[in-house]
Amino acid sequence: MRDTVDPVFSLGISSLWDELRHMPTGGVWWVNADRQQDAISLVNQTIASQTENANVAVIGMEGDPGKVIKLDESHGPEKIRLFTMPDSEKGLYSLPHDLLCSVNPTHYFFILICANNTWRNITSESLHKWLEKMNKWTRFHHCSLLVINPCNNSDKQSSLLMGEYRSLFGLASLRFQGDQHLFDIAFWCNEKGVSARQQLLLCQQDERWTLSHQEETAIQPRSDEKRILSHVAVLEGAPPLSEHWTLFDNNEALFNDARTAQAATIIFSLTQNNQIEPLARRIHTLRRQRGSALKIVVRENIASLRATDERLLLGCGANMIIPWNAPLSRCLTLIESVQGQQFSRYVPEDITTLLSMTQPLKLRGFQPWDTFCDAIHTMMSNTLLPADGKGVLVALRPVPGIRVEQALTLCRPNRTGDIMTIGGNRLVLFLSFCRVNDLDTALNHIFPLPTGDIFSNRMVWFEDKQISAELVQMRLLSPELWGTPLPLAKRADPVINAEHDGRIWRRIPEPLRLLDDTAERAS
């Protein structure tokens, strides 16, 4: 008796070569889609791409799948099985058991259409366990599972899945770019081999997906190490320095072109503080999706970066940050120095972990003594923050004649993460992410008067061990010695007998009678 041959299923994109299309039994594949309608269209054409006798089942999370799934009369199987499931984490874990109650999964092709942003509230650990479970299930039952996930943040989802290559046989994204679609393949493994980091233009006509004609013969670049993709502001008006340089008018266009790079140098420009978080997200996406050979440089054209911002960009995957005061000649030398480098630092898969590093303390201003100690302890215990770079702890003792409560009224921190408390006749400040060599500058911004005129003694701790040791001593202070701020003074009544003449305020004389009429008659 001859053994049954395991079927090989195909993704619904015409003209796509088999290395990027085939899905043999015993594996899980995942495709993110920017739009719901693109996801449904891809599912319908994928069904039509199967053989006439293929066993296909579609599982939908939103509504009735029978209203959106359409069978092609001339292509694909004559009938398919349709299922619905709840949009919940419990429903996902129950999926294998529920399918076994309805069908024999052997040689079946299951297509799971997720609801919009299904995975937003599911942790990466839960996602990892579910993929591992589905991988074992498909291998045991000789079936295939294709997950179609419509979401409005496919970059974040792809970054979370990049490390799941042991459970996923393929990961790709269908990106909508206004007048065209881009099929971004992170990796795809099947009986033909392994392909990775490819981007292909797709055409959609009459609900059919086809490979763009210009992509059918195009060869994916294997080495672009000499290419330099740069923001035009980096060269400060100079023309491209060689044929390897390509200039872009904005960071967004530069980012979109860098999506296809493998080992090129990418140079972003930074001119405003509000560009930092979007730029960090772009750098994180490129580093997670395009690999360690890419050289990512940030050129600060106008002074706008704090130490925490630099740490964020470097943590997201930037090789180097060039400061604003470096001349063009120095800038070009630094760009040349990163050539041939391999990025070796670890980049977390979820960028929110990195963003939380910039403001781990959501406090500002005066805090009670115990709250102050707890906040610093939490900061010192955060392993994601750099060693001996979490901030500076300062204890200030006021000069004779000034109470510590009065000195507190002069302390006006402006940054989130800068907190203070009073106790034991001391004003204690913690300046998050402040370097010890910048302490005097920071204190001059916090106090309106020179600190030497207000305080007679100052003690500083800036290393983690020093701060932790002082924190132990601070916790020993009895609550009776904890200080409290002075009560707010009542607002003075506004002066009503004054007017402004355009230059200064002038009081208006108010006539007063020393004797009233009764006193005059009595005299």
UniProtKB/Swiss-Prot annotation:
Signal peptide: none annotated. GO terms for molecular function: cyclic-di-GMP binding. GO terms for biological process: cellulose biosynthetic process. Disruption phenotype: Produces much less cellulose, and the timing cellulose synthesis and structure of the fibers may be altered. Deletion can be complemented by the protein from S.typhimurium LT2 or E.coli, however the 'D-415' mutation in the E.coli protein does not complement. The keyword Transcription does not apply. Keywords: Cellulose biosynthesis, Nucleotide-binding. The keyword Metal-binding does not apply. Binds bis-(3'-5') cyclic diguanylic acid (c-di-GMP). Required for maximal cellulose synthesis, does not act as a protease on BcsA. This is Cyclic di-GMP binding protein BcsE. The lineage of its organism: Bacteria, Pseudomonadati, Pseudomonadota, Gammaproteobacteria, Enterobacterales. The gene is bcsE.
